[in-house]
Amino acid sequence: SSVNARPCSSPLVCPAKGEKFFGVGSASRIRQLPPRLAWCSIDWDQLCLLHLLGSGGFGSVYKATYHGATVAVKQVKKCSKNHLASRQSFWAELNVACLDHNNVVHIVAASTCTPTSQDSLGTIIMEYAGNCTLHHVIYGIGYLTGNNDGLKRDHEFLSTAQAVVYSCDIVAGLMFLHSQLIVHLDLKPANIF
């Protein structure tokens, strides 16, 4: 099995001020993704949030479907107390969007434009890495498994052989990120799938 780490990266790459986002809106109010992320946009009609997977200081992550595929959707909330930090968190996560490695979660799409019903700084659609985190496995805590009938609890425990596999996969992912001059700033068992 392969371990994926949720992306949280540095150094920060932020677009220049005064540029238009996907050719719409006024230049002073809408930010544009960097040129290397120009493919990023979300077809909102194809996105269906299923249920909350978790939330943290800068946003919430949902299990969802996008164009029929199961994905994880991170909505970065507008943080009134620390707006700069929430913006930096959003842009830092997008730094890994162009990277391709088995142990790094892939970004499917992203946008700073959100439907008016959402109070969000931005949305990132990522590959769905599963229901069970390393935290669940280490501590034998039940994890949520989705099925058509709803949610149920299940658990498994970490063996020595599994610990070695997880460790090797984590090191491989980190070595790749470091080779790209990216540092994971939130590495913990709850962010390892």
Curated annotation (Swiss-Prot):
Domain Protein kinase residue range list: 47-193
GO function terms (MF aspect): ATP binding; protein serine kinase activity; protein serine/threonine kinase activity
PROSITE patterns hit by this protein: PROTEIN_KINASE_ATP (PS00107), PROTEIN_KINASE_DOM (PS50011)
UniProt cross-references to InterPro entries, sorted A to Z: Kinase-like_dom_sf (IPR011009), Prot_kinase_dom (IPR000719), Protein_kinase_ATP_BS (IPR017441), Ser/Thr_Kinases-Pseudokinases (IPR051681)
Location of the active site: 186
Entry similarity comment: Belongs to the protein kinase superfamily. Ser/Thr protein kinase family.
Protein name: Serine/threonine-protein kinase mos
Organism: Sibon nebulatus (Cloudy snail-eating snake)
